[in-house]
Each structure stands twice: as C-alpha cells, then as structure tokens.
C-alpha cells in the first residue's frame, strides 16, 4: 500500500515501503477501485512515478491511498469477446454475456516473422481504392486526411465491405478507437449490429475525453487481442484503428507531463520508437495474418508532419484524402496522385492493371498541369489534344466518385460495391475515348457497370433520330 506524494497534470509520484515497491507496468488502484494509475518509472527504493489511466468522480489528492494490484493490463481474448466493447482496463462497456479469458498486455509478442507470398488480394468494392491502391492480406494501409474529409466513413465502409465477404469462422475483426468521439464508436457499433457483422467483431475504445495514458495504452491492448486471435485461434485478423495519430498525440502529452525534452515540432523524442513498437507487431505469422487499416489525422492537412512521416514509413499503402476534392462534391475524396502503394506490382495485380494505372495517372497529371491555364484562358483555348485530355480527366475524376453503404443515412442513396473486372473494362474504355461524347456529369456516382454503355447507346440513338 502506498501514498500519493506529488501530482501534476496526469503524473503522480507514489511512495511505498521498500519491500512493497511495485514493478514497472503494474496497475495501482485508488479510491476503492474508481481511479487507476500505471507505474511508468521507479525513482528510488520507495518512490515510483505513475501515469493516470482512469479517473473517477473525485480528483486524486495528496496522501490518497494507492494499492498495487500486482498486475498489468489484462486483455480479454477468445471467441467470447465477439460482439463486446472493452475499455483499456478490459472492462466491458456494453451488455454482453459470457466470461472472458484474459492475458497480460504484450504477452503475445512474437519475434517470429512470416512473409506472406500468397499475395491474396482483398477487394474493397471501392473503385478508387481497388484501382490505385490494391490491398493484399497481411498488409498495412494508412488513410491520411485533415479534419472532416471522411476518414472515419471510409474505415467504416472498409469494415463493412471486407467483413461481409469473409467467412466469420476464419476471420476476426478488431476495431480500436484511439481518442476519437464517443458518437462515432456508438454509430459503428449500431451499424455492425444491424449488418450482423458484430458476431465476429471486438471493439476496444478509449475516447477523446479520457486521460492520455488510456489513449496511448489502448492500442497495445487491442494489438495483444489481435495477436492472440492470429496465433492461438489461428485466425486471419482485420485490424482497424481510428485514429493512430491520437496514439502518438497521447504519447506527446505524456512525454510533456513527464518532463521529457521534446524533439521536432514539439513531438516526443521517442516518436519513431513509439510508432515502431506497435507497427512491427501488426504482421503475419505462420498461424495467421493481420491486415491493418489505420486512419491518420493530418494537422493543418500537412503530409510532412513528423508524426505522419513516422507512420508512413511503416505502411504498404497510403490513401490521401483531399479537402479540394471533397469541396468539389466528389466522394470518397481520395487524391489518386498523392496516394500510392508498394503492392501495385505486375505479379500481384497483373500487367493490364499496371498499364491502366499508368495511363490514368498520366492523364490526371497532365490535367493538373493544365488547370492554371484553363482558369486563365478557358478550355476552348487549349490545343485539341489537350482538350481531349481534359475531357477524359474530368470523366475519370467523376467516375471514381461512389455512393457508400456507410454514408447512405446521410446521402439517402444506396451504397454500391464495384466489381473489379468490370471497373477495369470501363476505365480502359474511358482512356481509349470510347465514351468521349458522354458529358462528364453523367459519370458521377454511377451504380451498375452497365450504365455507361446504356448512356452511350441512348446518345447515339438520339443523334440518329435528330439526323433523320
């Protein structure tokens, strides 16, 4: 039993007798189990420094009694957790029956690495992702964007579209909410229940109003559960994080509270090791795979922010959301020229796909170069060849807009799951000029892949009638 001796911000110095000094990582209980601290550092034979994990109704005061639980974070694991929501301490946040097996956080870390050579493509049904940023099982995907451009909607759509294609007996889905809004977690849970996907999903949530210690530790807790599912249950894991930037932000707050010297842009000096410690665990083993999807908040929409760069270095693919594209009313607002994937290889997606991506990017890049000239002179002043490029680029930009299932409650329009082969056929026809006579606006939010051919046939029919 110890006593709180000093406190500031979310950091507390707690004194114990010499023979009762707790270990680093142990959880301390205060105020009859209403408040919890985690031992971060041992200062002397009798003094430890701890960070706040959970606060009760009353603030922690000097001389408050702290009891060493002699345990670290206990993580609920196993099939019984399907459909359950947990906090960082493993407490159940929703009504869910059953007893849970628990393992200690980080006890599932494996040094064994297994490189997946199967290159199994995961189709998301989202045209712009499946075309520009293909996803394979066991890869890491980052979704970068500033505030309010649709990161959370996209990650919810990915959960919905990918999960419903997989056999729930072979796949386990984890969602880790790191410092985001309570409302978003509640909406996601309701949507998972309504779509019957909750039966293979576990959620670990630390909300934005919780202490920085909780927001930082929730990610290792969620990863521990995912590693257990991969290795002990031999599942293929889909691991979704919203928002991994908040994990690093919480680390920055803790570093400041602990009095550590900051580095570039005010971030903690341990920024690189903090992100490496979690990213390296999101890997495949001989028992199963972990495919991770991570939203990344961009402060001031800056891709060069040190936290964003640190995260980007660990990813196989990155989706970059654009405020300009969002303002044009095109959704998902993904910028295909800024987004990239190391998985866009001929041996993975095929020669035809690679060549089409190169052709489309060439058209979009040329269009971007012409934009300033168009603003000054207008499209009609361009050379005929450039006018053709502009028309194709505008058709392509609109073609990649898509109604999403998770946005249907806002748009009042049903979602659409795109077939990859049909999409490639249509894109090839667009770049070949097969649809060049169709107005650009007709390409917006297309549903069925047959629509463009129908529109073209109707236009040709109208032209013949006018000629006659």
From Swiss-Prot:
Bilayer disposition of the protein: Peripheral membrane protein
EC numbers on record: 7.1.2.2
The keyword tRNA-binding is annotated on this UniProt entry: no
Compartment list: Cell membrane
Gene3D superfamilies on file: 2.40.10.170, Bovine Mitochondrial F1-atpase, Atp Synthase Beta Chain, Chain D, domain 3, P-loop containing nucleotide triphosphate hydrolases
Binding site for ATP: 145-152
Family, as annotated: Belongs to the ATPase alpha/beta chains family.
Name of protein: ATP synthase subunit beta 2
